[in-house]
Amino acid sequence: MVRMSKEWPEEGDLIVGTVHKVLGYGAFAKLEEYEGKEAFIHISEVSSGWVKNIRDYVRENQKIVARVLRVNPKKGHVDASLKRIREDQRTRRMQQWKIEQKAEKLLEISAKSINKTLDEAYDEVGYLIMEEFGDLYEGFELASDDGENVLLDVDVSPEWAKIITEVAKKNISTPEVQITGYVDLTSYKSNGVEIIIEALQSIESDNVEVQCVGSPTYRIMVTTEDYPTAEKILSEAANKCIGIVEENDGEGSFHRELED
């Protein structure tokens, strides 16, 4: 069960629950992120239209996303609404919850690796990660991408930082996109070949690969985490190598498609 660092949700929060009781006047749902807590959805908060039969809208064991209307910790009451939430908000919140389920599983794997329970993991590191990074998965993702120092920097213990990073790197793969562009490079100097090689080598990196299609055309392949970043890197790489050639009395041009 994914856990929140706070005991109760707050007014306006979007909560994930499982409906466990449906009555004529409303429904009760166990809250997935608040252990032992439940929310009540009155029939008037089920749909914006007239509800003749509440079971046409909610049923037992159904996963729901609802907006918190009122919280009374003294009475143990949470009132929530299904109608005061847009469909895109509902979808995003459910996706977020599923991602956090995966993160909790990674935390559990990390804990077992050092002979600790999930409860101990939350108390010793889980809530700290949530406080520092917003949610558990973000902490694991950053550890996978940047290494254990990102955890050490927020006072995660070396033991936890090491094992969380190991588990993250094994189980989280950063999504990648790849785009391609082409440059035509021509040099009229006696050392023109060396100038072009220098220009192409200047743009090669972990994200940028250069291939010769056939003089004067060269393929530039960019691999990174998203398309806007890839387009920016491709444009900068093409401009850089063309600039070097032109500074040496040559010519260069960039095109996205391989010309016949």
UniProtKB/Swiss-Prot annotation:
Taxonomy of the source species: Archaea, Methanobacteriati, Methanobacteriota, Methanomada group, Methanobacteria
Native source organism of the sequence: Methanosphaera stadtmanae (strain ATCC 43021 / DSM 3091 / JCM 11832 / MCB-3)
Limits of the S1 motif domain: 12-83
Protein name: Translation initiation factor 2 subunit alpha
Function: eIF-2 functions in the early steps of protein synthesis by forming a ternary complex with GTP and initiator tRNA.
Keyword set, alphabetical order: Initiation factor, Protein biosynthesis, RNA-binding
Subunit structure: Heterotrimer composed of an alpha, a beta and a gamma chain.
Record's keyword annotation contains RNA-binding: yes
NCBIfam families: PRK03987.1-1, PRK03987.1-4
Keyword Isomerase: no
Domain of life: Archaea
HAMAP family xref list: eIF_2_alpha (MF_00231)
Pfam families registered for this protein in UniProt: EIF_2_alpha, S1
UniProt cross-references to PANTHER family, sorted A to Z: EUKARYOTIC TRANSLATION INITIATION FACTOR 2 SUBUNIT 1
GO MF term set: ribosome binding; RNA binding; translation initiation factor activity
Family note: Belongs to the eIF-2-alpha family.
